[in-house]
Amino acid sequence: MPKMKTKSGATKRFKKTATGFKHKQSFTSHILTKKSPKRKRQLRGTKLIAKSDVASIKRMTAC
């Protein structure tokens, strides 16, 4: 059986860390005027992937 190809989109979106995978928070690119400063502040930075999604991310990124 041939090797599975990695999903190139997933490779760009998720980075492997020591404890799991991190990703950029969504809802931060446009239409920011209606979002409160608190909401925008909390959307900053990166978040860790939920434990239930780690297996599927591993399959997509071949880590």
Curated annotation (Swiss-Prot):
UniProt entry keywords in alphabetical sequence: Ribonucleoprotein, Ribosomal protein
Top-level taxon of origin: Bacteria
A GO molecular function annotation here is: structural constituent of ribosome
Q: Which Cys-Cys disulfides exist here?
A: none
Q: For this entry, list what GO says about its biological process.
A: translation
Any Gene Ontology CC annotation: cytosolic large ribosomal subunit
- Family (UniProt): Belongs to the bacterial ribosomal protein bL35 family.
Question: Would you tell me the protein name for this molecule?
Answer: Large ribosomal subunit protein bL35
Q: What is the lineage of its organism?
A: Bacteria, Pseudomonadati, Pseudomonadota, Gammaproteobacteria, Pseudomonadales
